[in-house]
Structures are given as C-alpha cells and as structure tokens.
C-alpha cells in the first residue's frame, strides 16, 4: 500500500491508480483509424479524449512541482476544441507519454504535504463554493479523467468494440 505524506491526499491515491488502469483498459484494442472517427461530426474523437486525459496528468504534475511539459499541450490544454485541420498524435504516442508522466505525478502525490495542498491555485472558475486550492485541483483532475474514460467507453461501444474490461495489471504501480 502506498502511504502518502498527506492525509488529505489519501482518497486521491487509489483513484489515481485505478484511473491509470481504466485509461489503459478503455483504449485497449482501439485501432488508430477508429481512434480518429467522430460521430456525425459532433463528437470529439478518441485521440482527442485520450490526449485531454493525458494533458490533465501533465497539468496535475505541474501544479505539484514537476517541470515536464505535455508535448501536445497546444492541442489539448484546457480542453481546447478539436480541430480537424490539426495533426493529432497517435494513440501509441499518447500511451508512451502516459507511461512517462504518470509515475512521476504519482510520486509527487505521495510526497506532497497538507500545507502544499492548501496553497491557493487559481484557475478562474469563479464558482463560489469551490476554493481554488491545489487539493481541489487534484480532485477536479480526477473528475475530468472519469468523464473522459466514460466518453471513450461510450465511443468504444458506438464503434462496435466490446465494453471496457476492468482488468488490473498489478505490475503498474502508478
């Protein structure tokens, strides 16, 4: 069991690890061709969803002090709208970056202190009941990851793939 320095982050740790598993499972078997398909020109494609998921990991890492930058930040930062004129990375490229940044962010989650998590991190939401702290940002990142995995799961079914499996690879420690 991973023991974080912060009691406040204890809820985030298992969710983060499960999201790692879910992300890999929901993308399992999706072809590169299908990953770029949109439904009636109305949906984002799976590559965009996966890229935005990955961008959340980079953003969380940045908030926790990592210097790593998302090589595709220009395509995905803050849920930037899909633009079919852009050349998006392949799922393989995104997965490689996912395996690079995710363990680093996980380590930062284990090391962060309560004091650091209480620091203000303004993102300009302007929602009166949300205190913009690093802890709340971490929670919102996980919420976004949930949402994106659900969207990819729905796209799997629409594109005639089987539903996502909930297998766990115990060798992945992040």
Predicted regions and their residues:
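Surface-exposed helix-capping loop/turn segments at secondary-structure junctions
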Residues: 29-36, 108-120, 157-162
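Residue-level recognition of alpha-helical structural elements
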Residues: 5-8, 42, 87, 94, ...
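Acidic/histidine-rich alpha-helical segments that form the ligand environment
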Residues: 82-121, 136-145
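An acidic intrinsically disordered interaction segment
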Residues: 14-21, 111-116
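Hydrophobic alpha-helical core bundles mediating ligand binding, dimerization, or RNAP-core interactions
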Residues: 16, 20, 27, 98, ...
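Extreme N-terminal tail/first-helix region
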Residues: 1-17
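Short, contiguous alpha-helical
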Residues: 13-17, 24, 34-80, 123-174
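Residues within well-ordered alpha-helical secondary structure of globular protein domains
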Residues: 29, 52-55, 100
């Amino acid at each position: 069991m991973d023991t974080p320095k912060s009691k406040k982050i204890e809820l985030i740790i298992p969710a983060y690890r499960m999201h790692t598993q879910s992300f890999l499972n929901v993308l399992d078997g999706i072809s590169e061709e299908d990953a770029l398909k949109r439904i009636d020109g109305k949906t984002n494609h799976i590559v965009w969803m996966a890229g935005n998921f990955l961008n959340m990991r980079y953003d969380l890492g940045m908030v926790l002090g990592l210097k790593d930058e998302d090589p595709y930040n220009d395509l995905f930062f803050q849920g930037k709208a899909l633009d079919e004129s852009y050349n998006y990375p392949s799922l393989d490229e995104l997965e490689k970056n996912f395996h690079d940044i995710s363990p680093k962010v996980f380590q930062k989650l284990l090391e962060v202190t309560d004091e650091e998590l209480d620091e203000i991190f303004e993102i300009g939401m302007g929602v009166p009941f949300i205190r913009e702290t690093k802890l709340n940002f971490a929670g919102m990142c996980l919420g976004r990851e949930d949402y994106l995995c659900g969207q990819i799961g729905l796209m799997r079914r629409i594109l005639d793939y089987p539903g996502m499996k909930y297998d766990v690879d115990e060798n992945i420690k992040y």
